[in-house]
Amino acid sequence: ASEFWKGTKLEMRCADFLAQKADEQFDMLVANPPYIRHHYIETQTKKRLQHEVMSQTGIKISGLAGLYCYFMMLSAQWLKDGGLSCWLVPSEFMDVNYGVAVKRYLLQNVELLHIHRFKADDLQFADALVSSCIVVFRKSVPPSCHEVKFTIGGTINNPETIRTIKANQLRAEDKWTNLFNHGPIQTEAEATLGDFFTVKRGVATGDN
């Protein structure tokens, strides 16, 4: 990669991203972190990363979390306020217990904008048989009542299905993939029968 980009303004650093301290902040971060399960993270490294997550986000993360979770939750130091962050990661965090910390971070610490989920047979990792998703968020305080775009299938720019879901509904949903699997979601009733009719019990036949 260094040879390919030689002669450009791109600076290549070969280092442990999670051990670096941000010496500069950027408007955008695009990442595809390594998919490494917790079994393969050294104990001392895991403890250090858990401490860093708690220190930077105020959130306790499970020791069962994969390495990509730490990447997402420790990335804000590299972003300017209002900066955008885009991640290609496994989608399992949306349903498993260790993903609670990641989902809390996305709803509480940043402004979650969009999650695109690839279909199960559309693998994005050549060396890992996992379903994938793209997560986009902004480094900003989330609005009190904002909406998140959920898309599935196809590409992020040309998905098969598009849904808009309120953040409050996400907070109440344990398994976010349920929001992809069911039919269109009606988050608020636009009208009820009572808006058009007077509803009352009719005459009960045989009541004599």
Regions found by a protein language model. Name each.
Residues 1-207:
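Signature of N6-adenine DNA methyltransferases within the class I
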